[in-house]
A protein has these predicted regions:
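Glycine- and acidic-residue-biased ligand/ion/polar-headgroup-sensing regions
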Residues: 63-81, 90
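Histidine-centered metal-chelating micro-motifs
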Residues: 55-57, 76, 92-108
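A short beta-loop-beta micro-motif enriched in histidine and acidic residues
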Residues: 51-66
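Ligand-binding loop in jelly-roll beta-barrel domains
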Residues: 97-128
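Short acidic-glycine-tyrosine-enriched beta hairpin
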Residues: 37-40, 49-50, 79-99
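Extracellular/periplasmic catalytic domains that process cell-envelope and extracellular macromolecules
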Residues: 38-39, 61-62, 69, 84-85, ...
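A short, N-terminal "cap"/entry segment at the start of jelly-roll beta-barrel domains
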Residues: 5-8, 14-44, 85, 93, ...
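Flexible, surface-exposed loop/linker segments and immediately adjacent secondary-structure boundaries
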Residues: 38-45, 88-91, 112-117, 122
Length: 134
């Protein structure tokens, strides 16, 4: 009886975990830091490395804006209104609340395309800096 009870107690968390409720995320997150800027503002700095990444889940940033800098490789964005490829030492800016990601017209990058990105975002302290949309 003791073994049965112990087995049930250990198994419940495994059964109860709902994988479908996991939040979407960006691939290849290497590091993420938050810096207090004062006046209830923070700066999020993320570094990402990924390969064969044509797009991201649909989302927006309720932040003052987002700067994405390509440290190495090739990435792409539609922030200018049409798709553009960005390579090493180039960057783009994403305005606040711009819904993007998951676009049907996202171009495929060639197989083996890798990117190293530095993402800098200023947001209000205590608020989400990225909101994923189902």
């Amino acid at each position: 009886m003791y073994k049965l009870l112990l087995t049930l107690l250990v198994s419940i968390p495994l059964i109860a975990h709902d994988h479908s409720a996991e939040k979407p995320t960006f691939p290849g997150l290497i590091s993420s830091e938050v810096f207090n800027l004062g006046n209830d503002m923070v700066m999020h700095v993320e570094r990402r490395n990924s390969c064969n990444q044509d797009g991201t889940p649909k989302h927006f940033h309720p932040a003052a804006g987002t700067l994405v800098y390509v440290l190495d490789g090739t990435s792409q964005s539609k922030s200018s209104g049409s798709w553009k490829e960005y390579t090493k030492n180039e960057y783009w800016f994403e305005k606040s609340d711009w819904v993007h990601g998951g676009e049907a017209d996202t171009p495929s990058l060639p197989e083996g395309t890798c990117q190293q990105l530095l993402v800098i975002r200023v947001a209000e302290e205590g608020k989400e800096h990225t909101v994923f949309i189902d």
